Amino acid sequence: MAPSNIVVQSSSTPPVAGGDEEFAPSVWGDFFVTYAPPVSQASEQRMSERAELLKAQVCQAFDAASMDVAGLVTYVDTLERLGLDNHFRDLIGAALERIGAEELPEHGGGLHIVALRFRLLRQHGIWVSTDVFDAFREDAGGFCSSLCSDDPRGLLSLYNAAHMAVPGEVVLDDAIAFARGRLLDIISKGEVRSPVSEQITRALDIPLPRFTRRLETMHYIAEYEHEEAHDGLLLELARLNFVLVRALHLRELKDLSLWWRELYNTVKLPYARDRMVEIYFWTCGMLHEEEYSLARMFFAKTFGMVSLMDDTFDVHATLDECHKLKEAMQRWDESEVSILPEYLRLLYIKTLSNFKEFEEILEPNKKYRMAYTKEAYKLCSKNYLKEAIWSNQKYQPSFKEHEELSIMTSGLPMLTILTLMGFGDEATPEAFEWVSSVPEMVRAGSQVTRFLNDLSSYKLGKNKKDMPGSVETYMVENGLTGDEAAAAIAALLENRWRILNQTRMEIDHTLLPAVQVVVNMARANEIIYLHGRDAYTFGADLKDLVTTLFLKQVLPL
């Protein structure tokens, strides 16, 4: 979970509203409860019927056998960036097999196509050697200076592709440094036109492999029509699909807002963050496709409940109350509610009742997933208690101790399991076992979350209670200044992304659904903590993005 950046309360009853130490109220209130989308049910039905016709036409046009490799690479990338790939998974899978098996002809498509092929294959778990970039390097090993200004699209593709590096790939370190420097220079001089200029600016903030796919789709649909070789069929389908998926998201957000309002008003914990809209934005950044509706609902509801528990441990409960809350969670039985202080009893009862509802929703052959879910939730409470003990004792952990605990308190292992609970048959028992064991990839995803979070806290000058974050812990242990320690944590963050990349290409493909959840959660965190903000705790920082993604009418039909 995101850290609670306010001072601990020591009373045993909720604080009176109005103190400087409280979180700001929701910037949305009940807006999405009453919001009426401009798309009517009837027009939505017509759009859906039109979209189905267009999908059939795309299937006919998508002839992998007749396209050359460069054309296939471009077509697959276009489908993915337009948010259409989930409708053509089998066709894309066949195309990727051919793209991986066939080499590009010499200088086929230039740097742009070579880099695009490299990125696509690695993102889909297919190994590609960095040797493909040798043709664009000089004898001394550096990249050719001729790439500086005459191929901005190629430089951008190289920059994005290089962020699929695995640990130790010096060639891609050089590629990132080279391309970033040239792209910054191009932008500062205004040497590139729209839409490439916007795409460069976006990538310099967050490289494409780490950017949330739904936001990229929102931007790219508006940009795609300005490309000379754009496909009108794909553009129309992408616009329809975006509006239809948004309509589904708005229905889900309304349902979640109603659910959250009832929960938040029932448990009466005014010290806790009221952030369901931000949670749902986070959810869509992780999984936006229609088929993951149940997974989104499980994720958002659980995130909301664990956030209430997190804030209780962090900013309000006494240490004795923390022990009692942890103990009640371990027992997982409504009859144990009496061990809790009065103000926490409704939170406990509502948590258990919501988990019962989750189980009732699951199909009989998927109910085994609840055991993993409950254990993960219980483990969260154990680790929150450990943080509370450290804070109470003013304990200065070693960096290793802090890292080990924060992997679990990041919430990513538990939330990955909760998300997979809403998947279909592609989420196997082996996937639940794998995530529950917290393997290296889950650890790396958790560390991406924690390091982004702690870099934000350092820049904001705030931390959980008086608990040191990873920046402060690293600084003390290594005798560094704060900025030096922050730079070291940023380097560790980059390394963890590379571990995520490496695991995608090495892991058993039956685990790829779980792998993708971990990667997508890390992607969503890049947006939440962009430029050192904490847009979950400080919801106003996310308001413009929420407005654009869910409300702004930017797509003519």
UniProtKB/Swiss-Prot annotation:
Segments carrying motif DDXXD motif: 310-314
Cofactor note: Binds 3 Mg(2+) or Mn(2+) ions per subunit.
Record-marked site positions (Required for the use of hedycaryol as a transient intermediate during the reprotonation of germacrene A): 303
GO terms for biological process, alphabetical: defense response; diterpenoid biosynthetic process
Coiled-coil region: none
Keyword Magnesium (UniProt): yes
Entries under SUPFAM superfamilies matching the protein: Terpenoid cyclases/Protein prenyltransferases (SSF48239), Terpenoid synthases (SSF48576)
Binding site for Mg(2+) 3: 453, 457
Cofactor(s) the protein requires to work: Mg(2+); Mn(2+)
UniProt comment concerning the protein's domains: The Asp-Asp-Xaa-Xaa-Asp/Glu (DDXXD/E) motif is important for the catalytic activity, presumably through binding to Mg(2+).
Family under the similarity heading: Belongs to the terpene synthase family.
Protein name: Eudesmanediol synthase
Source species of the chain: Zea mays
Lineage: Eukaryota, Viridiplantae, Streptophyta, Embryophyta, Tracheophyta
